[in-house]
Amino acid sequence: MNTELFDIKIRAVEGGVTAAAGFKAAGIHAGFRKNPERLDYAFVVPDKPCPGAGVFTTNRFCAAPVQVSRANLGGADKGYGIIAGVSVNSGNANAATGETGLACARETCSIASQVIGCEPQQILVASTGVIGQILPIDTFETAIPAAYEALSAHGGADAARAIMTTDTHSKEYAVSYVSEAAGHAGNVYTVGGMCKGSGMIMPNMATMIAVITTDAPVEPAALHALLLSTVKQTFNKVTVDSDTSTNDTCIMLASGAAAADAEPIVEGSDAFDELAFAVHEVCESLARNIAADGEGASKLVTVNVTGAVNDEEADIAARAVANSPLVKTCIAGHDCNWGRVAMALGKCGVKFNQEDVSIDMMGMPVCRDGLTVPFDEDEALRRFEASEIVISADLGAGDAATTVWTCDLTHEYISINGDYRS
């Protein structure tokens, strides 16, 4: 399909995770955190059980809620099912907690299922916070009924606040579009979402938790395929500090409430392509927001790599630049030091010839044919005042390209993480 034309028909809307019809959410203070002013529990519930899919951390030290949610979606080889609710707590990761942690995650599903009136396997759970501390189940016994009573079609903003840890602000986004696809033409579909993430961010499916919703009718397996592809192109292109969390979770639900009589969208159809485009818009916005809100960050950094031998090498090269402390600190210092970009590219092991490499920083040519290009230092300093810094490197070795998002590295990152548990 012609996505350039389709892009015109997408519009941003308010509401985040509850922007799509058929969903309610709540964010409350449950007691996982000591500060009574801090929301720490989010509950997202469709009006009726609906198709759901999940993508989870690749960290082998994965947390109890990841293990339980993965199992409730049919295991690692499936990843989708019919879901009645999503429970997210902040302040405690329930990771490295053994059988006690697993029992807590399973009991959370049981409590939520009793409140909603569904099967425990229809509940997905996620946790974020400090690793290695036992998560008190009694807090869920009061939190879940309270959150259920607080559910609202306008509760997306509170839910987004409740899942924050070191985030400086909540993260939510939503779009609507008018379908032109056969069987769906004229239907208005909405995709919304919320996420959290600021540190321990290099998802490989950041700590990253995201919940995406749509009111389009989608076949469950198609929903998983769509989510898996989108996560690879968006959330997996974010790195704040090169650390992959124990708790990375991305969940998507499809209520079908905007077109109850329409046939479910299946993979390979025009309707699938439309929805995938809208989901990508939401997830890319959220992913960029995570990078921009990296712990201690003052700037979003976009790293574009072109001319790689293949997609894998493009990704390796872009991540090498994005994860380099020397690159990140020179950006924090407003220093157009392209030599650090060249260093990061050269050490990462991908195939290219030095004399074929070109590097631009903030649109300024600084390296051509592997050699320095004279540039105006004052103009570079002016451009580095921008809130987003763009680094572009052409390896001249092939046709593959990618984009990775990161942030600069400041003294504040050390302060935040040095004081994290205090």
Give the ranges of each region predicted by the language model.
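A structural signal for small-residue-enriched, beta-sheet-centric alpha/beta enzyme cores
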Residues: 2-107, 113-422
